[in-house]
């Protein structure tokens, strides 16, 4: 396989953590991982309020349990997805098959775009529910900073995941170009589908096998001097 296919060198090389952490997509994964922790951590720790007059806790976002559940679910799943693809980034240089690398990069594009969309939905949902929340439900303003942090980092996550999708698409384009020769090129002399054998440049000298040597004129074929006119006797 050609070196550099889909953004990584030839398979079998030694693992280089310094090169890994310098990759833009790896940096964005780590940032997205941190953002997801902030989102679900803020909601789990301070997203539910207690009212002395009520026995059960309620969600800080307009008392809508779906808002808190959505933020926690998306945050946890995005956290796990980041870990999965960070592990894939570590293993990716060891993948020797160009087709397998292509599948990994395509999955990166799809998953990253998927999470960018879900973070966009989550940001809109949480921001809307926060705007319509009633002050009387939280007179002491408990957990307001955490609620705003979850909204803000949901917004930031849109761009980190979209950036991962863009970088993965760039890797796909570069990888497709670099793998083109190794996948499609075939030596004509080894191609059995060709109707005729390839032309072989004749070499100087004798050809004992009689296969493609230089043409040899028969000895004395054209060496005889032309004879003069011979009169016929009558």
Curated annotation (Swiss-Prot):
GO cellular component: melanosome; Schaffer collateral - CA1 synapse; synaptic vesicle; synaptic vesicle membrane
Region feature Disordered, mapped onto this chain: 201-234
UniProt keyword DNA damage, yes or no: no
Gene ablation phenotype (knockout): Mice lacking both Syngr1 and Syp show normal brain structure and composition, but impaired short-term and long-term synaptic plasticity.
GO biological process: cellular response to leukemia inhibitory factor; modulation of chemical synaptic transmission; protein targeting; regulated exocytosis; regulation of long-term neuronal synaptic plasticity; regulation of short-term neuronal synaptic plasticity; synaptic vesicle membrane organization
Membrane topology: Multi-pass membrane protein
Entry-annotated residues carrying N-acetylmethionine: 1
Domain of life: Eukaryota
Domain MARVEL, residue spans: 20-173
Keyword annotations of the record: Acetylation, Cytoplasmic vesicle, Membrane, Synapse, Transmembrane, Transmembrane helix
Ranges annotated as spanning the membrane: 24-44, 72-92, 104-124, 149-169
Topological domain ranges for the Lumenal compartment: 45-71, 125-148
InterPro entries: Marvel, Synaptogyrin
Record topological domains on the Cytoplasmic side: 1-23, 93-103, 170-234
Compartments, as annotated in UniProt: Cytoplasmic vesicle, Secretory vesicle, Synaptic vesicle membrane; Melanosome
UniProt cross-references to Pfam families, sorted A to Z: MARVEL
Family: Belongs to the synaptogyrin family.
Function: May play a role in regulated exocytosis. Modulates the localization of synaptophysin/SYP into synaptic-like microvesicles and may therefore play a role in synaptic-like microvesicle formation and/or maturation. Involved in the regulation of short-term and long-term synaptic plasticity.
Protein name: Synaptogyrin-1
Protein species of origin: Mus musculus (Mouse)
Gene name per UniProt: Syngr1
């Amino acid at each position: 396989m050609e070196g550099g296919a889909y953004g990584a060198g030839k398979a079998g090389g030694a693992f280089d953590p310094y090169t890994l952490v310098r990759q833009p997509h790896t940096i964005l994964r780590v940032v997205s991982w941190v953002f997801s922790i902030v989102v679900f951590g803020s909601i789990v720790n301070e997203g539910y309020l207690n009212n002395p007059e009520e026995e059960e806790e309620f969600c800080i976002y307009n008392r809508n349990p779906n808002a808190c559940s959505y933020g926690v679910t998306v945050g946890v799943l995005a956290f796990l997805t980041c870990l999965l693809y960070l592990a894939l980034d570590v293993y990716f240089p060891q993948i020797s098959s160009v087709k397998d690398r292509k599948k990994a990069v395509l999955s990166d594009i799809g998953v990253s775009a998927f999470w960018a969309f879900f973070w966009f939905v989550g940001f809109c949902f949480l921001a809307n529910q926060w705007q319509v929340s009633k002050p009387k439900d939280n007179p002491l303003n408990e957990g307001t900073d955490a609620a705003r942090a979850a909204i803000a980092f949901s917004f930031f996550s849109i761009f980190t995941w979209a950036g991962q999708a863009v970088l993965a698409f760039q890797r796909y384009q570069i990888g497709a170009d670099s793998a083109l020769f190794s996948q499609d090129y075939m030596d004509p002399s080894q191609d059995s589908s060709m109707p005729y054998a390839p032309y072989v440049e004749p070499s100087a000298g004798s050809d004992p096998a009689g296969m493609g040597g230089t043409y040899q004129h028969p000895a004395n074929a054209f060496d005889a001097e032309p004879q003069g006119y011979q009169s016929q006797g009558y």
